[in-house]
């Protein structure tokens, strides 16, 4: 068994009285985070014990935080600093702009009699909720709740709850199906599986929509007004949500349309942002900013839920190698025509399909001999 964690997003029903209590608590929590962030930035201290020793009394007295809230503020700030250090490798002070509140399970929030009980600065409030397919996660004999985040989005309140549960591990010996997945621009994905079946998800409409977003963003940037900057931010959020929804649908379909114990094989595209020189200028925005990583992560956790696995392999020559005779030559591929023609044996097919076929073959090689340290990167 291995553990898996997903985030359940649950809307809670808030009346005007409860809204005042929640807003006040979230605002004070946010202000306390900024206070602690200032101190951490000056001292470079990221230890919970020493921060608690110096700041706990101030958080309790000056911000009127309850004991657990004060501890949670410290953890929230420490986590934010560590994330910045991991991603940017430099010392920067994070600013907490939006009101927020991190709630510890069974201390700051609990679930009783079909209501969430949430702690505020002025006592607990009991709130009903809309499950929207999330009620299955409320069986605490199977699912364990973690520290939730309370957010206010366009006047609606949500609990983002990390839910952890056990899933059966997928062993190499159990694999019964292999799917090679080639990701790109003209086709979001092209697939090839153990039944010799190919599949395609066209990227034409998505490519056009992203180009429209890019054009609109450039037009707004030229105006350089506060209104245009707000619109640019709103467009960015809209585009990201749209992209994430597409990746959710694609990854869900991949898992749903394949049996348990499937091995999904992806190219390791970790260097995609540094590969713009190999992409047509008009396609660079689409290629470089396309959320390959988001699709990859969504597929990984959905595959685990279905007792399946994902591996990433070296992408070199996957578009130049003939899957029939193994001949590798750059001239095999006509990028403009999206056509692959082997100069050795004459085999012809769509170039994205060829990529998927070669990834499928590498998946088979992995199953035959999993000791391929220079080629295969397992998750």
Regions found by a protein language model. Name each.
Residues 1-75, 92:
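Gly/serine-rich nucleotide phosphate-binding loop at the start of the catalytic core
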Residues 4-8, 16, 20, 154-379:
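Positively charged, helix-rich recognition surfaces that bind polyanionic ligands
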Residues 4-12, 123-132, 136, 199-201:
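Generic detection of short hydrophobic beta-strand segments and adjacent strand-loop junctions
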Residues 36, 72-85, 353-366:
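Stable alpha-helical structural segments in soluble proteins, enriched in small hydrophobic residues
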Residues 38-43, 50-51, 88-97, 226-233, ...:
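Short coil/turn segments at secondary-structure boundaries
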Residues 51-156, 289:
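Acidic carboxylate diad motif detector
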